[in-house]
Regions:
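Terminal low-complexity/charged segments
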Residues: 1-180, 343-346, 350-353, 359-361, ...
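Short coil/turn segments at secondary-structure boundaries
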Residues: 47-49, 263-266, 298-303, 345-349, ...
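Structured, non-membrane catalytic/scaffold regions adjacent to prosthetic-group chemistry
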Residues: 81, 87-111, 235-251, 258-265, ...
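Predominant activation on well-ordered alpha-helical scaffold segments within soluble catalytic domains
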Residues: 96, 100, 223-231, 249, ...
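Short, glycine/acidic-rich hinge or "gate" loops at secondary-structure transitions
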Residues: 109-117, 267-274, 299-303
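Detector for conserved single-position "signature" residues within domains
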Residues: 145-151, 155, 160, 175, ...
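Active-site- and interface-proximal helix/loop "cap" or "latch" segments in soluble metabolic
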Residues: 155, 159-263, 268, 290, ...
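Intrinsically disordered, low-complexity regulatory segments
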Residues: 274-278, 288-435, 440-441
Length: 511
């Protein structure tokens, strides 16, 4: 059945623009996935929950060339396992494993190893299905069955979960011959915090604060996606000024992260000068953000109905001056990076993900655009005010560290121009509207292009102004598996550089 047949049956869904939804039974679950893949679509997120106290469901959110589709499978009590889609969308494997860890819903995926459960609860307990928190088991931590690579001269290097430096934990198991990487297998989930369960304990009008803390470097993106879903469910139209202020905050966040990454990438290539210069620029950018909007990282700037504060004339002047100061310095540092033979040698042809592989694995966001995956929600599924702005889609086709650095430079400069455009075109009016709790059972999904890639928040209203279910999705879910492929054939000392060129979130993945 062609994708068009499914779309003809689909209904509009609340939240992000371009969203459609369809309900299917188990016999058609894989058919939809296969038709989406054949049409050039890709899986963004997969999660499970309850439609009522006893009924269970599984949901997948797929991105299409001209929209997004939410596919819901209500589970028949007689259905023992949901048909797996890991052969259609390889990124589904970890999502399906997490689905079982949290809800007890098993798929036919042959990989049944735990993903988020690190012996914090018994194997037979599922945190999203009971009111009481499961008791931690008294038995030792489960052994995790890494895939073994055997052969002459092959040995393993375990790295982590505790790393040097101030970063979150993750385990990397390298199988190597000499210094050459034959295989990398990741073990994540060490910072699982029970975020999805915590959402169900909060009022729906306060959930945006937790959403902003799913992955702290993407606070604006997650808070906006949450509020976008909530506002759609509540039939609230955000004032134009509020929408423009949100876009301003999102681009400020994008610039700050790109500045930090470009410095760190220089450092990982042995160019400490790059780190010191970009950290200086990032600090100046954060200080300007704080002077203009009273927060460095804008954790609580986006609120239901708009923003928590307005931008005053002196704040706009501060940001405009920051752009004029920053842009020429970024251009000069770009020249230095491009002309430095040692840096270029480390970046070029390192950690390559060919466009064909990127498409097959579902690489998204900045890393995807560096491998010719030309999708950007700000252009392809724009919410206001992006539909009114001329957003440059920055794409490269080499797929190596150099390409990911190039896309960062391009996006940084493009975002600086966007900030100036927003400051000049900021409409008058209110910066927030009143939002009331939506009716029980209503649902919506927010979609926002964060600096790392597409951020999604699926929200369902519960009784008495509460939350029945909330699933926040970080693009790191899609991109962590691709990193395992990017390092194959490279040498072990290049892994920190390759890893940083993706700069994926542990917290956003681990929930």
């Amino acid at each position: 059945m062609a994708l068009s047949r499914w779309l003809e049956q689909a209904r509009a869904m609340l939240g992000a623009p371009g969203l459609r939804a369809i309900d299917v039974d188990a016999s058609r679950w894989r058919d939809v996935a296969q038709d989406v893949a054949a049409a050039g679509g890709r899986l963004l997120a997969l999660w499970g929950g309850r439609t009522r106290d006893t009924d269970r469901k599984v949901v997948m959110l797929v991105l299409l060339p001209d929209g997004a589709l939410v596919v819901t499978l209500a589970l028949d009590r007689a259905l023992e396992r949901v048909p797996g889609i890991e052969d259609v969308f390889p990124s589904a494997t970890r999502m399906q494993r997490a689905l079982y860890d949290l809800t007890g819903i098993r798929t036919t995926d042959p990989d049944t190893r735990p993903w988020l459960r690190h012996a914090a609860w018994p194997a037979e307990a599922f945190p999203l299905t009971t009111r009481e928190l499961p008791t931690p088991p008294s038995r030792p931590i489960d052994d995790y069955a890494f895939v073994r690579v055997e052969g002459d001269g092959v040995h393993e290097i375990p790295v982590g979960p505790v790393h040097a430096g101030i970063i979150e934990p993750g385990h990397f198991r390298f199988s190597i011959v000499g210094e050459k990487v034959l295989r990398l297998e990741q073990r994540l989930g060490y910072v699982h915090k029970g975020i999805e369960r915590r959402f169900t304990e909060l009022p729906i009008l306060a959930g945006h604060r937790l959403a902003a803390r799913v992955s702290g470097d993407s606070a604006v993106a997650f808070a906006w996606a949450y509020c976008q879903a909530l506002e759609g469910m509540s039939a609230v139209r955000v004032p134009p000024r509020a929408a423009w202020l949100r876009a301003l905050a999102l681009e400020l966040e994008r610039c700050a992260n790109h500045l930090g990454d470009l410095g760190a990438l220089g450092n990982d290539a042995g160019f400490a000068f790059g780190l010191s210069q970009f950290m200086r620029l990032k600090e100046g950018w954060l200080r300007a953000t704080e002077r203009a909007l009273d927060q460095r990282y804008l954790l609580d700037f986006v609120v239901p109905g708009g923003t928590s504060a307005d931008l005053q004339a002196d704040g706009a002047s501060t940001l405009s001056q920051a752009v004029r100061t920053l842009e020429p310095e970024v251009r000069k540092l770009r020249e230095i990076y491009e002309e430095h033979a040692g840096v270029r040698d480390r970046f070029l042809a390192t950690g390559t993900v060919a466009p064909e592989l990127a498409a097959r694995l579902g690489l998204v966001g900045l890393a995807g655009r560096a491998s010719a995956q030309a999708f950007d929600l700000r252009v392809d599924l724009p919410c206001e005010p992006y539909a009114s702005l001329e957003v440059t889609k920055c794409v490269h086709d080499a797929g190596d560290v150099l390409a990911r650095v190039t896309v960062r430079f391009d996006e940084l400069l493009a975002s600086l121009r966007l900030v100036e455009t927003i400051l000049r075109g900021l409409p008058p009016g209110d910066h927030a509207a009143v939002v009331h709790a939506p009716a029980e059972g209503s649902s919506g999904i927010g979609l926002v292009e964060g600096w790392r890639g597409p951020v999604a928040v699926a929200l369902e209203a519960g009784p008495d102004g509460g939350i029945r279910r909330c699933h926040p999705h970080d693009p790191s879910w899609n991109n962590w598996p691709v990193l395992e492929h990017a390092v194959i054939g490279n040498i072990v000392p290049d892994f920190p550089l390759i890893n940083k060129s993706f700069n994926l979130s542990y917290s956003g993945q681990d929930l």
